[in-house]
Amino acid sequence: MLSTSPRVTIPDVTITDYVLRHAARLGDKAALIDGPTGRTLSYRQLADGARRTAAGLARRGFGKGDVLAIYCPNVPEYAIVFLGVAMAGGINTTVNPLYTADELAKQLRDSGARLLVTVPPFLEKAKEAAAQTDVEEIFVLGAAEGARPFTDLMQAGDQPPAVTIEPAEDLVALPYSSGTTGLPKGVMLTHRNLVANLCQAEGMRNFECFGERDITMAVLPFFHIYGMVVIMMLGLAGGGTILVMPRFDMMEFLTLVQKYRVTILPLVPPIVLGLVKHPAVAQFDLSSVRLTFSGAAPLGEEIARALSTKLGCPVVQGYGMTEASPVTHLSPTHDEPFKPGSAGKIVPNTEVKIVEVGAGGDAELPVGKEGELWIRGPQIMKGYLNRPEETADCLDRDGWYHTGDVGYVDDEGYFFIVDRTKELIKYKGMQVAPAELEALLLTHPAILDAAVVRKADEEAGEVPKAYVVLKADDASKATPADAIMGWVAQRVAPHKRIRHLEFIDQIPKSASGKILRRVLIDREKSS
């Protein structure tokens, strides 16, 4: 099935050129505002900062194909770093700011990062992680004793290096995703992937995209593809203002929406639920909001309708994944039926077909029939970094990306996601790979075997639940569940913590030794 929106022309330019296309004209207009402090970066400062960053990187020998890791919460300078690296021909690998030093080190090693940018509160963790890798230098946004400030990098002038970038071939972003299965993997995204996705959102029929008069809330993290592309890149490309929050706090969020007259709220379902239920919402003037957009995880129809009524504006969903840069579907904002609970319609220049799960064929199923979504378009990744087999498992020779998500399309072209075949857990829209937690659990001295599955949760959407087989000795058998969960919590980022644990005599497995997760998920649902 093809998109019903008109095809869009995708220019053969870099992501920096596309995002900063209006910067000279917009000049002193606020591009990004730091919500807690009010500190502002204008479009002129953003463009100048990106050029100076590129020049400074080049002077240090950082060039085409080199990787820089960004280990920061949301700050206005995030955009300067990202666009400066892109201008230098480099690749940004964006890291979850909640990662432990060990988790950070894994991504630094896997991505081959040469440089690391962080903030003062994260410096010690960054140093600990970098010491285990080939990272050559750490830069800090701000001041920290014994650290090189990022501003040092910007003293090499404002002439970026003359780098030849092939937008369709050269990588610019390397976010990490668990994909349909296994451990987090580097997703290779080119300049063209990102530019295409911005053009697709801007060209979507009956979707009022971000414009120059919009003020967009950026509370969702920039390290995540949703925050990186849908909020930061799309908002700046449209010439609007991005209001940046480093972390979510309901009262501060509401205060900032009211103070700055925010017009667009890109959210995830847990925040949508909070806005529906929190009594303080009624105390604030949120009438400036014209559009609320929910992504990263499914949003229930009743919750969407409730927030739409409360705010007096559309609450629409989209659908996508890191591997698609990320958007493949958007819900119309006007002149078409409002269907809460739908993932929306196909964006321009994109094909989608629904295929019978596990059938081994590629025949497209009819309208209303549930199956796995396959997607093809210019926004689809090049593949997973250094993982050709895992790339081949999900990206076929004809260019179709097999999402692992199960859904159907209705007779008006609206898609609905109902289940997924892939293993990953979505905690507040953030990915948790069961295999990663299982590998960690198996290093616990009392554990013989373990499996991790998703458990439904009203607030978080899903949380990790572990099924654990203890070793036979008396000491191991006496190990309480809370002790194991606490042990895991000390070793992983907060969103990966195991929230429920059940002891079991045996982990169900296939003849080849593969964990039968569906058996455990069904057991969980019936309990």
List each model region and its residues.
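Conserved AMP-binding/adenylate-forming core of the ANL superfamily
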Residues: A31-V75, A79-L83, T100-A105, T151
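AMP-binding/adenylate-forming catalytic core of the ANL superfamily
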Residues: Y99-D102, K106, L116-T118, L265, ...
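Conserved AMP-binding/adenylation subdomain of ANL enzymes
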Residues: V195-I215, F223-I264, K277-H278
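ANL superfamily adenylate-forming
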Residues: P121-A168, L183, H278
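Adenylate-forming
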Residues: P73, T118-K127, L220, P246-E252, ...
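A short helix-loop-beta submotif of the ANL/AMP-binding
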Residues: D66-V67, P73-T93, P97-A101, K106-L115, ...
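Conserved AMP-binding/adenylate-forming
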Residues: L46, G240, T292, L299-V316, ...
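Conserved adenylate-forming
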Residues: L57-F62, P160-E169, L174-A218, G240
